[in-house]
Amino acid sequence: MGAESIHALRDVTIQIDKGEYVAIMGPSGSGKSTLMNLIGCLDTPTRGEYYLNGKLVSTMNDDELAYIRNKEIGFVFQTFNLLPRATALHNVELPLIYNGTAAAERIRRARTALEMVGLADRTNHKPNELSGGQKQKVAIARALANNPSLILADEPTGNLDSKSGADIMALLSELNRAGNTIIVVTHEREVAHCTNRIIYLRDGKIEREERPVGLKA
């Protein structure tokens, strides 16, 4: 007998418009990570189509995908992924360094991003001099540095205490009100209910969608 094919996602159809604030929620094995990788252009579907800003992702070459990941998508990870020996400012500069932004301009943009997340007084601090919540704010500032069309946050409060987690979700809500499109991947109901729309996955399929109580459809 041949190997059985395993489908991480099956018949998933989602449209997320500019300016939306969406949570993707589900238990372990539901397909959240796979969907996040597809949305973030870290993987491509074996079947079906994914359009980002009207562009069909599967037709892009490696250089085009790298450009999209750098310029169009701001990633926020559960584990922060900061360089331990670099200052907050330098960590935020990284995506700008990769795309060749001139030094003076990237420093200006990195400082502006840190100001946006309330860390103007922490620009020269290294990660070991910051709290967990401050580290995640640096990660969010890094995601904002290129002014991306989409912020993709994977379990952004997973390594934080409840107060720091609430602060991060309040910051993401503020960024959404300023016009940023944000997708949060989470298994925490409290986090999902900070968004405007929740997409529930189970066994690789969309189980249902809902809007948190008190929000207009």
Please identify what each model-predicted range represents.
Residues M1-L201:
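ABC family nucleotide-binding domain
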Residues K205-A217:
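Conserved beta-strand-loop-alpha-helix hinge in the C-terminal portion
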